[in-house]
Amino acid sequence: MAAGGAGGNSGKTYSFKVVLLGEGCVGKTSLVLRYCENKFNDKHITTLQASFLTKKLNITGRRVNLAIWDTAGQERFHALGPIYYRDSNGAILVYDITDEDSFQKVKNWVKELRKMLGNEICLCIVGNKIDLDKDRHVSVEEAESYAESVGAKHYHTSAKLNKGIEELFLDLCKRMMETAQAEERLKGNGASQSASSRRGVQIVDDEPQATPAGGCCSSG
């Protein structure tokens, strides 16, 4: 179900599915753990197939429930990607700024997502590990130019230093809310059900509660 108009959404709860994609060792799991639990482990954490975390937020008086899927980056798990990104409202495509190949693999994911889900999914391209900027192999200009060319937004993050992560997820949530609200307006005008509606955006009337902006998070 899609969202209502911007003027009457103060009592709504939005439920969104977000998937993280990218090569192994780019730091996807570290980003999610830093965002949800404010934890960081210097040791590489290998994700097998996928892990799942949730985050609850209050954004401009509207409650948002995020279901965040962290997928495995190993090539042997690539074929499982569609299982996790179908029905997603947003995708975070992560590369390591010190690894040019990981950036090229992001381009493959973008092509696949656009082919399977169309243009309505909100895409974020993330250059992670900016704490290693002296070893950078992907230029800021190249990455930002590419993101703009495919209708995505680009972000720089460091899970180690806890930089850029809150901004990334907050901005993505706002974009998904805007998309959902636009779909609800179309629905109110008698338009046929859209792709994002079919992807399962859930917005329900709710009694607003005083939830801190940071929200809470639990593993599932």
How does the language model describe each region?
Residues 58-61, 83-87, 114-119:
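Conserved catalytic network of the ASCE P-loop NTPase/AAA+ motor domain
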Residues 64-77:
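Switch II (G3) loop of P-loop NTPases
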Residues 1-25, 63, 120-125, 129-220:
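Conserved P-loop small GTPase signature centered on TRAFAC-class small GTPases
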